[in-house]
Amino acid sequence: LRLVTTTRSQNPISERWPDMREAGIGCLDAAAAVGRDPFKSAVRLWMEKTERHDLLQPVDPSLIQSAATAAYWDRLLEPIVAAHYALRTGRQVKRTRALLRHPQHPWMLALAGREVVGAPDVQLLECRCVGMDEAELWGAGLPDYVRIQMLHRLAVTGAKTIDVAALICGQDLRIHRVERDEVKISRLIDAEREFWHCVATDCAPLA
């Protein structure tokens, strides 16, 4: 795994990441930035990045750690998904707590996440927990918006391959592979650059 310019801090990355997200486009922002996220529009993402919180629906702070949210179960089950990926594939997985920034495109950010150690064919692992409301999108394979997110991560990290281990509805573990594609990454960077120009110039993207 070749890591590009890395930002580190003594503070836990989970505490710093909400602030850092406003300084660039993260992996989970990528599909929304290019208008391909079924759950978030480019306009909403722009409002978040430009801190137009008065235009966004308020989020109840008590729900952030609530067991009623998908994010809660994601955080809880991700280590289990990673462990079962290692068990099924026989590969060693190591978590890396580093925030990365692309050297040529400083607005492109990504968490290093999990690294697959000593495997010649894959370098990174992404773990997802897919609930009932999202499972249909995974019926035909890896959803397009997730593939875009993974291409963003490959672009920032410099890695060639990432496996996506997705636990569907708590009982069906599926593994999808995303290979580095320079043509698609170049197009993604161009589209993300246009979005970030909208953020930098405080001009909303087209709906």
Predicted regions and their residues:
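Charged, glycine-rich intrinsically disordered N-terminal tails and low-complexity linkers that flank
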Residues: 1-76
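Low-complexity, compositionally biased segments
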Residues: 22, 32, 40, 57, ...
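Residue patterns forming the tRNA-binding/recognition surfaces of aminoacyl-tRNA synthetases
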Residues: 199-207
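A generic structural signal for solvent-exposed, polar alpha-helical segments
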Residues: 23, 52, 91, 201-202
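Nucleic-acid nuclease catalytic cores
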Residues: 71, 84-200
